[in-house]
Amino acid sequence: RYDFRFNQLTSQVECRERNSFNFYFLPVDKRLMASITMNAQYEGLKLWDKDVVRFLNSDHVPVYQPIEEFLYDLPRWNGKDYIGNLAKRVPCDHPYWTQLFRRWFLSMVAHWRGMGKNHANSTSPILIGPQAYRKSTFCRLILPPCLQAYYTDSIDFSRKRDAELYLNRFLLINMDAVSYTHLTLPTTSRV
């Protein structure tokens, strides 16, 4: 009756009802778990909530890796510079912006895949410009629609535990509306 999967990125079990108009997987919360248990009992299965919990926390639930699924479903690269074209959407007079953005982007994807665990991605693009200049819109464009659930622009670094959870939960964090008045960058470095 249900399809289950363990989302490795969010560390949550997700499910969807088979033969339903709802094609999307939803996180299994207490209410949904109670519904699953009740539906099973209505169908004659003799089980308790703890039995459902035990099943959902077992290796009987397949692992889902959203990043790997997306990357492996991409068509073979046709030689077109998609990353460079994305970088060129940002009006910038820095001569190396496109190459630096590409390096950051490839490093970001490599870290998603768990490559280079001994090294952090030590660079981050900083987009500086007037309000309503579509900086956040550009950041949202970096992730494809199927991975938008792993993007956020609301993070509170004052609570260390929350910040650490966000850093593990999201693929891309846009630190929007952060004051960079303490930075003194040359004009050509501003984007």
Residue ranges and their predicted role:
Residues 55-172:
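P-loop NTPase catalytic core of nucleic-acid-dependent motor ATPases
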Residues 176-177:
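Walker B catalytic acidic pair
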